[in-house]
Amino acid sequence: MALFNFLFSRKRNTANLAKERLQIIIAKKRQNEIIPDYLPQLKYDLLQVLCKYASITPEMLSVQLEMKNGDISILEVQVIRPEMLDNNRLNNE
């Protein structure tokens, strides 16, 4: 009887553990998918400012917002410089 209880109780614990892990994964995924309303406008404004000083296209600018621990936001802006594109094209030819 103890063997019977051991086998069936373990399955419930494993299922509960898997359920909790899945809930954590889903919550993290949802947290990262939330895009603030101002982010597209921020990208547009940054592009306009950068275009004053360099020949930048929208594809050369990447803006991402990452949330950490619920109270810390990290804004990451990546800009590919036109000179870098020209150097890569010359090296690939």
From Swiss-Prot:
HAMAP family: MinE. Keywords: Cell cycle, Cell division. The keyword Cell division applies. Belongs to the MinE family. The keyword Cell cycle applies. This is Cell division topological specificity factor. SUPFAM superfamilies: Cell division protein MinE topological specificity domain. GO terms for biological process: cell division; regulation of division septum assembly. Prevents the cell division inhibition by proteins MinC and MinD at internal division sites while permitting inhibition at polar sites. This ensures cell division at the proper site by restricting the formation of a division septum at the midpoint of the long axis of the cell. It comes from the Bacteria. Transmembrane segments: none annotated.
